[in-house]
Amino acid sequence: MTTNYIFVTGGVVSSLGKGIAAASLAAILEARGLNVTIMKLDPYINVDPGTMSPTQHGEVFVTEDGAETDLDLGHYERFIRTKMSRRNNFTTGRIYSDVLRKERRGDYLGATIQVIPHITNAIKERIIEGGEGHDVVLVEIGGTVGDIESLPFLEAIRQMAVQVGREHTLFMHLTLVPYLAAAGEVKTKPTQHSVKELLSIGIQPDVLICRSDRTVPANERAKIALFCNVPEKAVISLKDIDSIYKIPSLLKSQGLDDYICKRFSLNCPEANLSEWEQVVYEEANPGGEVTIGMVGKYVALPDAYKSVIEALKHGGLKNRLTVNIKLIDSQDVETRGVEVLKDLDAILIPGGFGYRGVEGKIMAANYARENNVPYLGICLGMQVALMEFARNVAGMEGANSTEFVPDCKYPVVALITEWRDENGNVEVRDEASDLGGTMRVGGQQCHLTEGSLVRQMYGEQTIIERHRHRYEVNNMLLKQIEAAGLRVAGLSADRKLVEIVELPDHPWFVACQFHPEFTSTPRDGHPLFAGFVKAAGAYQKRQVK
């Protein structure tokens, strides 16, 4: 099988939506029966995003095989059926780390290690490895053309076009075409200069995606084509749109997939986008709306909870409800009290790290439990629900996590000290262990308790969900908590770790140690989020009565 490569770059400004554009194109190609995957190459020097601040970088998306990756991989999985893995995302830091390790080992036989050829060769090797077994691999280059950090990646893909052959490579460049109200027209000069920048490093774009707040007129697209040396049919207008799920149809309507298939000599049927049309229809025709409060630590940057926000929307699609998400800083709950939680139809507490705002989350869990408000706790959201229940129901005054209070009387959440790595080797960790790459992370099997609410929602006895945490329920104190009425609804494969808890005497109170948001998609949704949004709608109706 010959793999075809589409290299996606961005110019003029950042945040043009390269990831969404790449994922949308991948969705069309997949709908044509092609085996497609997507890669994200990040130019920062961190080895991975695992220890980066969520308020700077956004969420860390966890893959099935346990890689901590860029949030764009979440977009990729929500748009195509192919599951991402650690092969789909790497950084400058990872490349340099690998090359330096080989140099120390003597693999280069004493050669002088340089950006060209050693770094660029390592980049090319990883791209080829990531694309193995696929008809088409889209490779998104992070950053903006002209950034110093991106140069080794751009040089690597330039070389790949020569080595793999232009018949199997295509350069797709996203660029900004701004509208100037004073002139009453769109301006193409920024695009021309962005392409000029690409040409200066030896890359001639084959497709231009013109981002604008409006449709770029045909005469302006013709002008761009002429001055940028690109066929007119390969200059695509991508205007701002009210739903990202309309983008596959928008790109297809301009013949982008036909152009690419012809370029790669791929003989495949027309794309059937009926699934995406159904998603757009459900989104545009809700039967009502609910308001869900998300109580978190990183609400200043909604991208820190990108997958949770999208999963809530997917839950809304499955219930024909618009989900209005109210982001609430957990510290506001501490200072202003539970008044900030009034008028919500449900409460969700997502994952997080560190003690700041934890007491506010505990107050929110308490409010949901005592007022029969539907509650979904994820990761830390489960741990705070457990601490709240232990304190106020099970009689464990001051119950806490050893993450926050190491010497507390009732450590209902504690650090797991023994882990097994992907090779089955036991690793011992403590509070002094490195933060990066030292968590229980990736897909883990979970056995659901017969008769539980989650068993009913999933419709399966055994599930696989993705984790990212260091702390777990302390089994030494579990029996006392269960005796007070909390039900363990899911256990790990070895039956040693608590994965899900729920309250049988509450209309809908579920908390899980894993991150269900990472496996939710607009086409399929997710059982927990669908059930949670449904419960929010039921709560709203009860309040009206």
UniProtKB/Swiss-Prot annotation:
GO terms for biological process: 'de novo' CTP biosynthetic process; pyrimidine nucleobase biosynthetic process. Keywords: ATP-binding, Glutamine amidotransferase, Ligase, Magnesium, Metal-binding, Nucleotide-binding, Pyrimidine biosynthesis. CTP binds at S14, D147, I148, E149, K187, T188, K189, P190, T191, Q192, K223. GO terms for cellular component: cytosol. The gene is pyrG. The lineage of its organism: Bacteria, Pseudomonadati, Pseudomonadota, Gammaproteobacteria, Enterobacterales. Residues 1-266 are annotated as: Amidoligase domain. Belongs to the CTP synthase family. CTPSs have evolved a hybrid strategy for distinguishing between UTP and CTP. The overlapping regions of the product feedback inhibitory and substrate sites recognize a common feature in both compounds, the triphosphate moiety. To differentiate isosteric substrate and product pyrimidine rings, an additional pocket far from the expected kinase/ligase catalytic site, specifically recognizes the cytosine and ribose portions of the product inhibitor. This is CTP synthase. It catalyses: UTP + L-glutamine + ATP + H2O = CTP + L-glutamate + ADP + phosphate + 2 H(+); L-glutamine + H2O = L-glutamate + NH4(+); UTP + NH4(+) + ATP = CTP + ADP + phosphate + 2 H(+). Pathway: Pyrimidine metabolism; CTP biosynthesis via de novo pathway; CTP from UDP: step 2/2. Allosterically activated by GTP, when glutamine is the substrate; GTP has no effect on the reaction when ammonia is the substrate. The allosteric effector GTP functions by stabilizing the protein conformation that binds the tetrahedral intermediate(s) formed during glutamine hydrolysis. Inhibited by the product CTP, via allosteric rather than competitive inhibition. The active site is at C379, H515, E517. UTP binds at S14, K187, T188, K189, P190, T191, Q192, K223. Residues 291-542 form the Glutamine amidotransferase type-1 domain. ATP binds at S15, L16, G17, K18, G19, I20, D72, K239, D240, I241. Its EC number is 6.3.4.2. Homotetramer. Mg(2+) binds at D72, E140. Catalyzes the ATP-dependent amination of UTP to CTP with either L-glutamine or ammonia as the source of nitrogen. Regulates intracellular CTP levels through interactions with the four ribonucleotide triphosphates. CDD domains: CTPS_N, GATase1_CTP_Synthase. It comes from the Bacteria.
